[in-house]
Regions:
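Hydrophobic alpha-helical transmembrane segments in multi-pass integral membrane proteins
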Residues: 45, 87-88, 141-148, 182, ...
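Selective hydrophobic functional segments
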Residues: 48-97, 180-223
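Hydrophobic residues within alpha-helical transmembrane segments
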Residues: 12, 16, 51-58, 75, ...
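Juxtamembrane helix-boundary/capping and inter-helix hinge elements in multi-pass membrane proteins
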Residues: 39-42, 64-70, 158-166, 189-193
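Selected transmembrane alpha-helices and immediately adjacent juxtamembrane segments
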Residues: 1-39, 122-171
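Loop-to-transmembrane alpha-helix entry segments
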Residues: 71-72, 94-108, 118-121, 220, ...
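Transmembrane helix exit motif
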Residues: 57-67, 89, 103-127, 215-216, ...
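Structural signature of hydrophobic alpha-helical transmembrane segments
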Residues: 6-7, 37-54, 98-108, 137-147, ...
């Protein structure tokens, strides 16, 4: 693939991902990771999403006035989801990336299918003490292996019954901490090169432009309908990644 086409793909991926985040408040890491894995490769996609994901999440994580409540309730989950990323990234260095791309596709497929079906787990407060650290650790390992932050982490945050505003802020906290953990893990395994880090920094620009556009579109679009389109698209993207990687084995 020539450099011009690669640049166009990267800009397009982050413009689209930023637009989706502007419309529904979430989705930049998931969309950019899926698109770049489908067109480039998994490791490159994981590195490129780091800075745009962090920059677009950090402000969202600190507003809303619920930070102390959220941290007090889910800090064991957040800690394990962050510190176990290095373990998953170690697997990334010794495993055929095509297998991990298939795993990523499967995670995206499952995540979108469950949301389309309206499936929700329910975890009572008395079970949060053990389920939070357990699912946090699983989420961290899968993040290190695939770059995806959403399964089972987002499902856990939905399952403990957080109100919408607190749920969104908790998810953004998870994504922000996971981005930091992933950056350190990739650097430790010599996968975070200066060249890719520079490109990731430049990718902030189309991400922010996309967010601004998405926020304007949001005013004239049904969020419910868009979410359905979003999850159907992620489902198709996950299936495509599975098929493409499977055929390449």
């Amino acid at each position: 693939m020539n450099e011009t086409l690669t640049v166009i793909i990267i800009i397009g991926a982050f413009l689209l991902a930023g637009s989706i985040k502007g419309i529904i408040g979430l989705g930049l890491p998931t969309v950019s990771l899926g698109l770049l894995t489908a067109t480039l490769d998994l490791t490159t996609a994981m590195v490129l999403l780091l800075i745009p994901s962090f920059i677009t999440n950090i402000w969202q994580a600190t507003v809303g006035g619920n930070g102390k409540f959220i941290i007090k309730r889910i800090w064991p989950f957040l800690c394990l989801a962050t510190v176990t990323i290095w373990l998953g990234s170690t697997v990334l260095t010794i495993t055929n990336p095509l297998y991990l791309s298939i795993l990523l596709g499967a995670l995206l497929f499952v995540y979108s299918t469950l949301n389309l079906l309206g499936f929700r787990l329910s975890i009572s407060p008395k079970h949060e003490k053990w389920s939070g650290p357990l699912l946090g650790a699983v989420n961290g390992i899968l993040t290190g292996m695939t770059g995806s932050f959403v399964v089972p982490g987002v499902m856990y945050l939905q399952a403990i019954g957080l109100p919408r505003d607190k749920l969104v802020q908790a998810m953004v906290m998870l994504f922000s901490l996971s981005t930091i953990g992933l950056a350190f893990a990739l650097q430790n395994n010599n996968l975070l090169t200066t060249e890719l880090a520079t490109i990731s920094a430049f990718a902030v620009v189309p991400s922010i432009i996309g967010m601004v556009v998405g926020q304007k579109i949001r005013k004239s679009l049904s969020e419910t309908r868009f979410r359905r389109i979003f999850f159907v698209s992620i489902l198709v993207l996950g299936a495509f990644i599975i098929a493409k990687s499977g055929l390449a084995l």
